[in-house]
A protein has these predicted regions:
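Transmembrane alpha-helical core residues of multi-pass small-molecule transporters
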Residues: 26, 59, 137-142
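Membrane-helix interface motif
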Residues: 137, 145, 149-156
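Transmembrane alpha-helix interface/packing and boundary motifs in multi-pass membrane proteins
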Residues: 17-36, 107
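Membrane-interfacial helix-loop-helix
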Residues: 1-21, 44-132, 151-158
Length: 158
């Protein structure tokens, strides 16, 4: 198990495609921190910045699209055994109904909201086409800004 930064960077370089797959998975779930760290590693040469942005963009888009589909297909009924989460989902859905355009651009940043937002978009009245278009644009902005923030932080810390 690698214990210092140089060893971690070497592992990333040796297992490049697997490392990109790992970042894709985290971008699809909800890890802002992992993408920031990957941007940091890109500045140090372990990842290609452009490829990393694309992987994060597609991962973020795909993760929210899957959550949207689940919300659209199953609603919130499948959460009936988790009443607290179901309440949080309905609160998030109310935000989506009133502020769907702004919310789709901002939901990726605060901790805890992203996990539920895709489902909330799915149970909202937002059309599939509107969601997919706005989600695609939002995921791209998120990927560029988050990877770049990690990249430039690494540049500043040199």
């Amino acid at each position: 198990m690698p214990t210092d930064l140089n060893q971690i960077l070497d592992v990333i370089r040796q297992h490049g495609e697997l490392a990109y797959s790992f970042v894709f998975t985290y971008a699809a779930t909800n890890s802002l921190l992992m993408v920031l760290l990957a941007g940091y590693a890109a500045h140090l040469g372990a990842f290609d910045w452009g490829k990393l942005v694309m992987v994060c963009w597609i991962g973020s888009f795909a993760g929210d699209a899957v959550r949207f589909w689940v919300g659209r297909r199953y609603g919130s009924k499948w959460l009936s055994s988790f009443p607290r989460i179901q309440r949080m989902l309905h609160t998030t859905a109310r935000l989506v109904e009133h502020h769907h355009t702004w919310f789709i651009f901002l939901h990726r940043y605060p901790n805890g909201i992203r996990s539920l937002a895709g489902f909330a978009f799915g149970i909202s009245s937002m059309s599939n086409a509107s969601f997919l278009i706005l989600n695609f644009i939002s995921a791209g902005i998120w990927a560029v800004t988050t990877v770049s923030a990690g990249y430039f932080f690494s540049h500043l810390s040199d």
